[in-house]
Amino acid sequence: MSRLRLLLSDSHDPLFNLAVEECIFRQMDPNQRVLFLWRNANTVVIGRAQNPWKECNTRRMEEDGVTLARRSSGGGAVFHDLGNSCFTFMAGKPEYDKSVSTAIVLDALTRLGVEAFASGRNDLLVATPDGERKVSGSAYRETHDRGFHHGTLLLDADLGRLANYLNPDPKKLAAKGISSVRSRVANLCELLPGIDHPQVSEALQEAFFSHYGERVQPEHISPEQMPDLPGFAETFARQRSWEWNFGHAPAFSHQLDERFGWGGVELHFDVEKGVIGRAQIFSDSLDPAPLDALAARLPGTAYRADALYDLLRQWRSEFAAREAELEELSRWLLAALR
């Protein structure tokens, strides 16, 4: 058996690619050195300990069809599109060493004609007339006997969209969890016009082979060519689930307020594991009974619009005399939780 393994994904589905990565990592021979190359279409990828409602503009993401994906490693939130090239290096311990994989990526960039250097927060930077700019970010994961280093290279990413989706709505969130630190970034196409994913992929493969003094044939993976990985279907289902991508968020509090013609409303939610644990509703409405009833029903409900839709419809039906007012409040609340 070769000590190297090279896998290339033909899928742009981030949930598929992250599930493949997870299965390979769990099942790899610890004596092998693995390189997995992939790309994702429009996606915000958040770190394992992050709160998507705090990190992301979830409303704009839904409107624009942008996927949210939680990865198993730490670190901050990043936006992926097809202008990013993604890489994952895996190895067993004690050979796993992220400085080795970083050196391989730097060698690949040198082969392409870009002189980059490693910086403190897991980034690769280049010097430009405007100062140092980030062209690659990484995150890491280790278990008792293996580890991986994965990251992205910015080729021709839409940096404006990155800023749009990584800025949350002005919601009043008091959240626990890890916040992303924004960095000044640059695309490699600014330094190498015409650079594309196949060129970067080829350079990474050559640097990988050169470092280990061995070559292997790539294994191509796609949804049409499902990977022969035990447990993949279950891992893929988990990666796609709301419970993992949203429900795994750290505990946080959310405050919403709005003034309607019939009175002002202020809602306070405590949310844990994506479920409303406590709800308080304050109002100067002349008839607060419907709001008291709603506050009593909200605990135990998933913190998402589709889960609240049926609850709100049933609640309104019990206060038919105020149907128009409660419909107005329901529309506002559902829009706020998107």
Curated annotation (Swiss-Prot):
ATP binds at R71, G76, A77, V78, F79, K134. Pathway: Protein modification; protein lipoylation via exogenous pathway; protein N(6)-(lipoyl)lysine from lipoate: step 1/2; Protein modification; protein lipoylation via exogenous pathway; protein N(6)-(lipoyl)lysine from lipoate: step 2/2. It is an enzyme of class 6 (ligase). Keywords: ATP-binding, Cytoplasm, Ligase, Nucleotide-binding. Pfam families: Lip_prot_lig_C, LplA-B_cat. Belongs to the LplA family. In the transfer reaction, the free carboxyl group of lipoic acid is attached via an amide linkage to the epsilon-amino group of a specific lysine residue of lipoyl domains of lipoate-dependent enzymes. SUPFAM superfamilies: Class II aaRS and biotin synthetases (SSF55681), SufE/NifU (SSF82649). Its EC number is 6.3.1.20. This is Lipoate-protein ligase A. GO terms for molecular function: ATP binding; lipoate-protein ligase activity; lipoyltransferase activity. (R)-lipoate binds at K134. It comes from Aeromonas hydrophila subsp. hydrophila (strain ATCC 7966 / DSM 30187 / BCRC 13018 / CCUG 14551 / JCM 1027 / KCTC 2358 / NCIMB 9240 / NCTC 8049). It comes from the Bacteria. Residues 29-216 form the BPL/LPL catalytic domain. GO terms for biological process: protein modification process.
